[in-house]
Curated annotation (Swiss-Prot):
Stated family: Belongs to the NGF-beta family.
Keyword Metal-binding: no
Gene Ontology BP term (one): modulation of chemical synaptic transmission
Basic and acidic residues bias (residue ranges): 47-66
Source species of the chain: Tropidechis carinatus (Australian rough-scaled snake)
Protein name from the UniProt record: Venom nerve growth factor 1
Location within or outside the cell: Secreted
Signal peptide segment: 1-18
Tissue note: Expressed by the venom gland.
GO terms assigned for molecular function: growth factor activity; lipid binding; metalloendopeptidase inhibitor activity; nerve growth factor receptor binding; toxin activity
Pfam families the UniProt entry points to: NGF
Top-level taxon in the UniProt lineage: Eukaryota
GO CC terms: axon; dendrite; extracellular space; synaptic vesicle
Amino acid sequence: MSMLCYTLIIAFLIGIWAAPKSEDNVPLGSPATSDLSDTSCAQTHEGLKTSRNTDQRHPAPKKAEDQELGSAANIIVDPKLFQKRRFQSSRVLFSTQPPPLSRDEQSVEFLDNEDALNRNIRAKRETHPVHNRGEHSVCDSISVWVANKTNATDIKGNMVTVMVDVNLNNEVYMQYFFETKCRNPNPNPVPSGCRGIDSRHWNSYCTTTQAYVRALTMEGNRASWRFIRIDTACVCVIIRKTDNF
């Protein structure tokens, strides 16, 4: 009887020893652990590759300020916006290349390469006009076409975003503004003052003035016309002298 019990106990212990061990209890460095580590590393590597490819296909969104100040060439503008004459200004130009230095008295314009070239030729003829009567300006001014204007003050006194360029009929047009300002502005009256002013009785100085023109601006995600303020003239300001001067 005792021999039978011993035999059963030994058989039971041998069966327990021969049973497969659980993966949770496998010691480090065992083949099962190595397989799991290799599998985990492979999955992690594949996950990194997938994430990198996903980032390349779907780049991170830009900041709102970058989108607001960026180029508007991707914004398609309806040509009907330019059909109404009340939206046109002689100091606003839409062109595919930089316009000439001088300006023709025209309304909102669109210049292709050939038109701009012809106007450049006309501009060279008009750059140095001949004054036969000794005509002089009271204040020296300079006029230039301004590009890349991104912000301006509208007629309500608010800062608005100006469209630098627009996509019209699958062509990108830059928006230019013809601005005039004093060559050497001086906000304080000086003895010399403006040209041709009697300095014995008047103090004078030159200053840049502004006017409103209609420009294409951004309102949310769409283009709209607004009155914005730009430099348009250089004028002379005179102040009568008193006995205290």
